[in-house]
């Protein structure tokens, strides 16, 4: 019988909230008897936006803004029904995007 695996990908702009959420997921999974691999840090996506400071001319005067998207990967091996139920009831911050694959 093949082993079952749950893969959880977390994304957030703030790395501190992301790490707290990952830690909550890992603690919950371990407490319910599943094996956990991770959190594995994935490459951070850095998006830079350049705009003109002045509304009409002065093209040499520009300003740059950047936004970083931090990502983490968690694999839960051999999850029990209790593990799945506990993960569904877990309350995580609103700034974290969660993608779950079975």
UniProtKB/Swiss-Prot annotation:
Listed GO biological process terms: translation
UniProt keyword list: Ribonucleoprotein, Ribosomal protein
GO molecular function per UniProt: structural constituent of ribosome; tRNA binding
Pfam families: Ribosomal_S10 (PF00338)
Taxonomic superkingdom: Bacteria
GO CC annotation: ribonucleoprotein complex; ribosome
Gene3D superfamilies in the record: Ribosomal protein S10 domain
SMART domains, alphabetized: Ribosomal_S10 (SM01403)
Role, per record: Involved in the binding of tRNA to the ribosomes.
Subunit structure: Part of the 30S ribosomal subunit.
UniProt record similarity statement: Belongs to the universal ribosomal protein uS10 family.
Protein's name in the database: Small ribosomal subunit protein uS10
């Amino acid at each position: 019988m093949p082993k079952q695996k749950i893969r959880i990908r977390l994304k957030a702009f703030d790395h501190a909230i992301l790490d707290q959420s990952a830690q909550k997921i890992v603690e919950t999974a371990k407490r319910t008897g599943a094996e956990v691999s991770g959190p594995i840090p994935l490459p951070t996506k850095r998006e830079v936006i350049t705009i003109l400071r002045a509304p009409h001319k002065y093209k040499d005067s520009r300003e740059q803004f950047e936004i970083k998207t931090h990502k983490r990967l968690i694999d839960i091996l051999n999850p029990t029904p209790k593990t799945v139920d506990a993960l569904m009831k877990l309350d995580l911050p609103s700034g974290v995007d969660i993608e779950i694959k079975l």
